[in-house]
Amino acid sequence: VRWHKSPRQRKISVTIKKTIEDGVESFEAEIDGEVIQWDRGLSYARHLQTDQLLSSQIPVSDKPDEMLFIIMHQTMELWIKLAVHEANIAMDQIRADQLGKAEKTLDRIGTVLRHMIHSWEVLATLSPHDFLTFRGYLRKASGFQSHQYRTLEFCLGLKRADLLLIHNDDEERRAALEAVLHAPSLYDELLQLLARRGFAVPADKLERDFSQIYEPADEVEDAWLEIYTNPDQHWDLYSLAEKVTAVEYYFQEWRFKHMKTVSRVIGHKIGTGGSAGVNYLVKALDLPFFPELWAMRTRMTAPKDGGNYADADGDANREAEDDGSCPYGH
């Protein structure tokens, strides 16, 4: 098969070779010095379902800025789907005591979250005027209704059974969320890991109703404190805990960027779904996934090593916790 450019262009002849591989027509051609291959089986478009993907942007208004709003949120949903996928893999790896592999997976989740953080900058190009041209068309549609976002929160450890209510009209999504609600979270798997390593994790934290809100325990905080105080003795647990902490750190940064973007676009208006908008998002910043991993940091003290006596008795930390000041005096 030969192909020629139009007469106005320099004539180029390309020979396409056709073969049959595994019963599928395959083709090969040399273009710009590169051998390009394709077949009638799996193509780029078929693999990625690009026809379906690129036809899924259906505005409800005739306002041009709505396309940005739709694509921004659709891409966010895809990244959240990947984060959920990786979180499930990480839980399987921790359950199997494959901590090195779990660290790699947690690193990937952190990278996904960092990408999601920067994606808010795209939505921030939407001015208040731009958004108001189509906001009314959205009616009560709201990110609060994202079942994937809720799935990710459940996977990481923030469980709220009452949040299933908004999915009552979709039995399939509600059932999927309910399954995650009643399953152990990433933090539950970490507690099981601590127990396997001999730490005194209370039985009621290991064998509990996973659909209920987790209540922190002093014994769990003590376990993390021991690991962080003596990292050389518990290096794999210490290293894993830092990866887990990074996941929450980036998730909270994503929440913060979400809140600031909403504030920039709509101020303190009520959200489209009826929530308090910015005020609701501010409250979410105080909802931790791994509470004892954060709490024990306040109790850590500096080792008495030469002239390093700062905070040796923990008084400075307690004062900072009491008055809310920065440990550097700011």
Language model features with spans:
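Surface-exposed peri-terminal alpha-helical interaction modules
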Residues: 3, 8-330
